[in-house]
């Protein structure tokens, strides 16, 4: 009886919160569903979610019980700061920041602050690829390398030793089936070692890095295996630039994020001094040790500020933004009728089609069609991100500004924690 009353009370609270911020959600929806369908995204007024969503919307005794449960969970994992956003049927129900955005400067976390997305960035890149397909600039079966391939530069072709590279397709890159492996470490985040091995004095840009990596043999025949690959999504970022004629970040912002109502997402910087306005500070877990700076300077740095060259991760893991805006992006690619999608129904279905043998979906980790949620995770030094899109219409998003000793395994514990919260409060 007490549990039913608790769920009812939270439901009323969340409905009140939705009504309170309804003008924000409605404004963002109107941007995508204007009766004047001939208007371009550029001609419509920009409504910035990050200017509207703050902790003040959920302050008060009514929220204290659920807030306290979440705070205890974050404290157990020694998380300095986090954002949790919950939507139902694409309507924002709950958005809250916990802990510190920058502890040393005394800045509390708000749900509108920017944090690194890590591999959640792959979902954004995948949406960009699908947009290029809809624009007739690209096909899933297009070959990536070779004289008739997308990246047909002779310097790439001259680097290739393994002829199987010529069979790699766009879809195989999206599904982590292109033949790449990480036996020698993740090549996209191994800049220092690649510099030493190839006698480079500066970190390689994307074309230089790709020419170096194409000399390696593939780990398996494209399409006949799977291995999670940041390199594959770095190459997809290069494909976006080649086919659009624009910088990757600019294309994604103009044709994917802004039409979805997301105006404050960016490629993140590597160092604390490079942070965006309203971006949080990042923290390592207790016991972590300094590492060599990615650029082979010989300096020892905190892993979250210099181990990886963030901009070079590009579409594999470099985006940053708020959990609030990220929820808008998810609402715009989920196939639900409440918010107009930025992609066609066919594209959304293709991205989320359940795959056999636990194969990867397009952009998502997995999109099962049973009673289990769609999953997208992300993990970098200093951050963790998790998206769970449930069959009942709920979407839960958690982003932290702190690493845990468990690395990407932290997401598994958070999934179980979300289930407990859903049973108790939803």
Feature roles, as predicted:
Residues 2, 22-96, 253-254, 295-426:
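Catalytic loop of the DD-peptidase/beta-lactamase superfamily, centered on the K-T-G motif
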Residues 2-15:
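N-terminal Sec-pathway targeting helices
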Residues 14-22:
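Hydrophobic membrane-insertion alpha-helices, especially the h-region
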Residues 58, 62, 66, 113, ...:
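Residue-level signature of the cytosolic catalytic core of signaling kinases
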Residues 62, 66, 117, 121, ...:
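Hydrophobic (often cysteine-bearing) scaffold residues that line and stabilize catalytic clefts
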Residues 76-83, 105-172, 220-231, 314, ...:
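Short active-site loop at a secondary-structure junction
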Residues 95, 107, 181-184:
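Short, solvent-exposed loop/turn elements at domain surfaces
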Residues 158-373:
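Short, surface-exposed loop or secondary-structure junction motifs
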